[in-house]
A protein has these predicted regions:
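Terminal accessory carbohydrate-recognition/targeting modules of carbohydrate-active enzymes
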Residues: 1-221, 254, 262, 274, ...
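Extended, well-ordered alpha-helical scaffold segments
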Residues: 196-203, 207, 221-228, 275-288, ...
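Structured, solvent-exposed acidic/aromatic patches
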Residues: 387-392, 414
Length: 588
């Protein structure tokens, strides 16, 4: 049986559960899955929205697979049952006729290595407009074009019209370098090259080994999930195509196709340790699409950008302003000023957009005009509608202006340094006057200048600024550490346990989000609550290590992933990586 030589790949043997998590590769939009309970069939989906074909920003989630009933077959073209062993770079299938191995020849091409013992191959169903078989495979033309090819001797090449598509079977004979490839792309010039399989498999192993080899080491308790987290990030990378002008990371190729603004910024936290260029590109990627008025889109996908939505209200939509904060974290690891020089002016325009176009009453407190701009899509904070003058948003802006002050100093714009510091201090003071309730010891967001009395960790966010009086910090930390509110079995729920709107399974109405915990670790550390910060970091790491996969959000009591939480979630993986490294280095 094939076993990779890389200890990293051996460590992750069978961690990838292809019934729910796609087997993919860095840059690729091809996603291979197995059916639950079916030991003889795979299917292939595309990490593309294809909105020109099926309108709607989320319709891709329900689109049928591009290739269905992908099977391993014997000499007669009959399906073979298999047992699969998964690795980051390959799927290894044991059958009665021998071992098949599936890997990526390149980001658009899957390569099957077939047993040399007897003729065998693959079969599949596809739904194209045109089929054209030939001597060593064939081509299909549709929304995405597909070819299947072999470098072996063709025994059977059967293409049957099913009425709604085609059923294909290709059986070949050959040796250890014989392969069958599936190539899928948008263009008409299909790549029919079939490389010797052993070289293809070795290249895939070396590619992933190098990916893992470049990352910092961590202490043993974190190691297994740590390398899985690095696989999650690598597996979620999408290559340049259409509006993607550089590599970017999808939040989850399984559920969120595209690049979301604040997800990208959190992803940069991990990449700064192993690939500073990729880290910086997560930031540059969003600025590639900055609007003339300074706004940065909510999300970008191959066919376009998301800058406005009609639901639940019609308004411009973006994401929280943490770009300068993330850029400074990248700089702290790399000491490379070039990124700061490059993005400073665009970030200034982004900051001006918030204050200039999102303060309807001109009181210096900025609002969300669309709930999705908060990133907290279904939070009870928006139950009464928008616009909302939000505690979290003004905290982000305070952090952003502080980061701009640091950037200005580093790139030699000293006069602007003090200006940004003054602006950050002034906003922190306005937040106390505007939002703080001394009786409750909480900051309340407001709609129509009436407090929204929903207890969430965002009522504690101003702690992060480091500019609150000690008496206020003490009140905020007391709430944070209250086991009846936020210090749950697994802190921190996104709605307090004792709030009437708390729902531990519904997205932003109760579950734990790893990025929010990451922010509070930083906030606590900044304000001198080192022991609590370390405790929260460790409990966050333990929460993520408690499940096989890495999820979008977690139940604060059971630690399990609620049913709708996306798997292989990027910012959860990135924040886990950052916390694991810093805890291993005793930096928290």
């Amino acid at each position: 049986m094939y076993v990779p030589q890389s200890s990293y790949l051996q460590l992750l043997e069978n961690r990838i559960k292809i019934e729910s998590v796609p087997f993919s590769d860095r840059g690729s939009r091809l996603l291979v899955y197995a059916h639950h309970g079916n030991t003889s069939s795979l299917y292939l989906k595309l990490a593309e929205r294809l909105t020109a074909v099926v309108p709607g920003l989320s319709t891709y989630r329900n689109r049928p697979p591009f290739i269905q009933n992908l099977r391993l077959v014997d000499a007669d073209g009959q399906p073979l049952a298999f047992e699969v062993t998964t690795y980051p770079h390959a799927l290894v299938f044991q059958t009665v006729v021998g071992e098949f191995v599936l890997t990526f020849q390149d980001e658009r091409t899957l390569s099957f290595g077939v047993p040399a013992i007897s003729p065998c191959g693959i079969s599949f169903s596809v739904l194209p407009d045109l089929a054209r078989p030939d001597g060593n495979g064939g081509e299909f033309k549709s929304v995405r074009n597909c070819s299947y090819s072999t470098n072996g001797d063709t025994i059977l090449n059967r293409v049957e019209d099913s009425g709604s598509g085609y059923n294909v079977a290709l059986v070949v004979s050959g040796d250890a370098d014989t392969a069958i490839t599936l190539h899928i792309q948008a263009g008409l010039d299909l790549n029919r090259t079939v490389k010797p399989f052993r070289a293809t498999l070795q290249a895939a192993e070396e590619r992933w080994h190098t990916w893992f080899q470049t990352v910092p080491s961590v202490v043993e308790p974190y190691r297994n999930q740590y390398y899985y987290a690095w696989w999650v990030l690598g597996n979620n990378i999408l290559s340049p195509q259409g509006f993607f002008q550089r590599e970017s990371v999808a939040p989850s190729k399984a559920h969120y196709v595209g690049a979301w603004q604040w997800d990208n910024y959190f992803h940069s936290l991990a990449f700064r340790y192993n690939n500073p260029t990729l880290a910086a590109d997560q930031i540059r990627f969003m600025l590639d699409h900055q609007q003339p008025d300074g706004m940065i889109p909510d999300a970008v996908y191959d066919e376009g950008t998301i800058t406005n939505l009609e639901i639940p209200v019609a308004a411009a939509v973006t994401k929280p302003p943490i770009i300068a904060w993330s850029a400074m974290h990248v700089y702290e690891q790399t000491n490379d000023e070039s990124l700061l020089r490059e993005i400073y002016e665009p970030v200034v325009r982004w900051n001006s957009w918030w204050f200039g176009l999102n303060d309807d009453d001109s009181d210096g407190i900025v609002q969300y005009s669309h709930p999705f701009s908060s990133g907290l899509d279904d939070s009870p904070l928006w139950d009464s509608g928008v616009p909302v003058e939000a505690v979290d948003l003004n905290t982000y802006l305070c952090i952003q202006m502080e980061a701009l002050a640091r950037m200005a100093r580093i790139i030699g714009r000293e006069r602007e340094t003090e200006m940004w510091r003054r602006k950050a201090r002034a906003l922190a003071t306005r937040m106390i006057d505007h939002f703080y309730d001394p009786k409750a010891g909480l900051f309340w967001s407001q709609k129509d200048h009436e407090p929204i009395r929903v207890v969430t960790p965002f009522s504690l966010y101003p702690l992060w600024t480091g500019q609150m009086p000690h008496t206020i910090n003490e009140r905020l930390v007391a709430h944070l550490c209250d086991p009846q509110r936020f210090w749950a079995t697994h802190p921190l729920p996104t709605v307090a346990l004792d709030d009437p709107t708390y729902n531990p399974s519904q997205m932003w109405r109760g579950p734990v989000w790893i990025n929010i915990n990451h922010i509070f670790v930083e906030a606590l550390k900044r304000c001198g609550y080192d022991t609590i910060a370390r405790d929260l970091a460790e409990r966050t790491l333990q929460l993520v290590m408690g499940q096989n996969d890495i999820y979008e959000y977690y139940h604060p009591i059971t630690g399990e992933a609620p049913p709708k939480a996306a798997p292989i979630f990027g910012w959860s993986a990135s924040c886990f990586i950052d916390l694991a490294i810093r805890m291993s280095r005793n930096e928290i």
